[in-house]
Amino acid sequence: MLDKPATRPQMTRWQLAKFVLGRSFYLMVALLFIESALTAATTYLIIKAGRDVANDDFLTTDLIWILLAQGGAYAVGAVSWIFAERAGFGAFGRYMQRFARDNRHETKLLHEKGTREVVEPFLTGETFHIFFQLVYELEADLKLFFHLILNIAVIGSEIDTSFPVAYGIIFVVLIGLQMLARKPVARANLENQRMTNRMTAQGYTAWDNVFAGNRYNLRLWLAGFKVRLRDALRAQIKAIRTRETVSTVSGIFALIVIFIVMVKVSIQNAGDTEVLVMLATVLPRQIEMTKDCYTLAAGWNDMVAVWARLGGAVDNMYPDPDAAYDARIKYDRLVLREDEQAKTVGSLDDALKLVYGKRTGRINVRGGNGSGKSTMLAALKASIKNRAYYWPTTDRLAFQFALGTELVDDDEGIDPELLAEAGEPEQHEAVKKVGFSSGERQLKSLQEIVRFTDASIYLLDEWDANLDPKNRAAANALVEKLASRARVIEISHRDAA
């Protein structure tokens, strides 16, 4: 007996997030640390210059060293972006490879429109943006963390040890605040993602409803779109409000604490000109660091948002097929015709026995509309897996003959102002490429299947649907060629009575 469908094991968020790890990511982290170390060196040189001024020993070389250190930090930071991009693209590539590998045998999901509407946005861009948001947030947060830690160490050792203590208190309080706010922020961001995906999914039916020219259908489509648009806007505003409230409170708290410490140090060293001058020279850096604390808090909230969005990608990594999928097949309305014999089956097991009964030959699946012919072919593929080649009724499968024939506008969606700044015209002439009619695609696809595939079983769904009599005869000869070397189970109009 066939196993009953069970819930598939799910990937964790940590497993998905680890796709960004690799040589590029580690090099990015190393460069960020070097950049922060050079920035901390600049802080030290500024303090040293202030001390020299207080002691009437200031030299022009102090400025040169500051220039070299800070300039080096800028250069290293620029290089780190290259590896950040490589890490993001590598993560998305690994995600697509894993999705393809782990879902290639779930043929029962091919025609599940509801599941496809939910999962497809993650394949067409959502997960790509999630990975890059993750990489960018990690880059920004690590840069801030290294920057704060190293600069705090310099200021604490050169001016006053109260500053490291103050920043330590700030970190503890901010982490506690973020932990308290984590669930509300995550819930708001997850709802925002769901509503946004729901809104963008509506766009997949825009073309049909607009260009069909029917006022009735267009009115219904626009009404549905407006509802989803309003829901997405409300969810977006709620997510931003929740996130920014926590971040603002964190930033103000950090600013108050650091300025209290600065005032305290100034009072304690009122007669020490050297300390006061050094404190004054790092005042801009101190203000910058309080801003960094606020930004780091906001970055933590953004990381929570990315973590929530990772949950959406994880939830849709392994979609479950309908547990009652096989029940859609109306076996009492199906006839499996081989040669001159017509046979009936009562279950998918019976159909598999008939398929495995011979190594070659053709079985034509007959039945009325809604009897489950295509459903049975998909169920057979899900059971037979790699030994079967399945050709469904879709023209979206990748074939060699079609590579490079699609009319793709590389400038689609690009801001015209960006094209103008680059010195390129806003409208490009479409490159004329060879196109194929549905019948031509059908025949060429079948020719490629015969030539380049070597399965023991072929499942062909409506292979002659778009063919004229001449091309149907040519296609039938190709199917016969397949049947001479393998088992062919087909849905076709061949010899239809």
Which residues does each PLM region occupy?
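Short cytosolic helices in intracellular loops of multi-pass membrane proteins
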Residues: 91-109, 115-120, 190-230, 306-313
